[in-house]
Amino acid sequence: MTNNQPSNACRKSVPSSSKHIKHLFRHTVSSSDRHDVQQYLLDSEAELCRYQAEVNRLKAKITVVETRMGGLKRKIRKYRTLLSPVYRLPSEIWAEVFLFFCEGESLIPLKTPAVMVVSRVCGRWRDIALSTPRIWSTISLRFEGWTKGNGGRLDRLQSLLVSFLQRSKNMPLTVNLNSLRVEKQDEIDGVVKTLEGLLNHSTRWQHLDCTHSLLALPAFQSLRNRLPELKSLYVESGMRDNSSSLFHDCPSLTSISISPDSWSDSDFPLHQMKTLSLRRSYAPAALAVLRSCTNAYQLEMHSIGGMSRPDTDHIILPKIRQLTITAENEEDAMTVFQFSTLQSLTSLEIRRSSVNSVDWNRWDLGPVKDFFLRSSCALTSLKIGSVPLSDEETIQLLLLMPTLTNLSIEEYPKHGKNKIVTDAFLQLLSSDEDELASSFLPSLNHLDLIVHLSSLHIPSLIHAIASRAPDDMGNISESSCGLRSVTLTVMAKEKPDMSPFFELQCFGDAGLRMNIFHKTIC
């Protein structure tokens, strides 16, 4: 039971003479009275000291109790967080979150890497970060910031590299090395010295992204025959030099992205390639590389064209299934169609490299039609982006693709009006009893249109979608015939009035996957 009674010191009464002293206010104070008053004051002050001591004792006790109470409240708040859903996440999920958070970040001066920020939040996060080598296995550098200003920056970079290499343990490494743009030789020497530790771990490199000028440095010659785990390689353009043979003996290399003008077909184990990306090169150099890639199934051609001759040898690539062409002009778009046969092709994407490009105003589809007749491929996916085609030309091209299930068309933003998705195109897209219409894309399941609002004939679009909708839209599956999904993006200079498209939304309510967006253009 709590004792709330005051201490003995506080229970002492004030001296009994206080009544006598009180009467002195009405009488003359004699010498003996003065002595009594002085004694009373001495006794009262002593009593007051005892009271103050008791108050201080109680205040101290209150302070102690309040301190303990505050500490308990903090613990309650802290421990209550353990009941929140985030603490039910297993460590494996947190590791995936950290991987996503740290993805694509470069090591730059004056900024703590995201993975280290994560590891300093709390003890559990630190344990997860240090026990997950994958989040330390991507090393991305931008040299410019490390070589300018404070000379101690390279020392910090070296320390960071040591931490990443140690904490990644034996995990395969993804190495991104930005262009080396330094003017002084001592700066180059400093960077190379800093990278020695990374080069010593080249046997763990799985993905490498670097520049041709960096590979030309003498220190990088040690990579020759020391890249057993390298699977993918991206090299920026550069002049052909002694770095060309660095990757000749890479038993795991299956994906490269290069400019063929900087290499020869003997610089890589091309027969191993599964995915291939060729960039900014004349056609002969690119075709020389392609000729040996007989096992590749994915091919990307970015600005590849020109300098080709009519007598150029024809190439047959029997396993290519996916082809992406990014073109600046008609020559770029024609290279593959003129000089190759791809009988296994199922997916094709063709787009203009830049909306500001003015070099591509027309496209002769003769070689393209010849390509499809020659290849006899069963194309199932086609993406057309900002290419100079009319509706009639596009229709003639699509008539060669009866197996097409996915169609994506993006109009050229600079035209201001639709050249492909016209009223005539939409009327033909409508599936009805007309013989030509019934043979036009009979297997189409997914339609994606990016069009100008100003010249879009909405009633024809609604009719086309309605005519191709499955009979049972409420039960659409992957085996359903007809359209399963439609994505429409309308381009306009200002945010458009979307009310005319409300009628389209009824298809979404009925079960068709219907998405409508707008895109502001200049």
Where are these regions (language model features)?
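Leucine-rich repeat
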Residues: 1-522
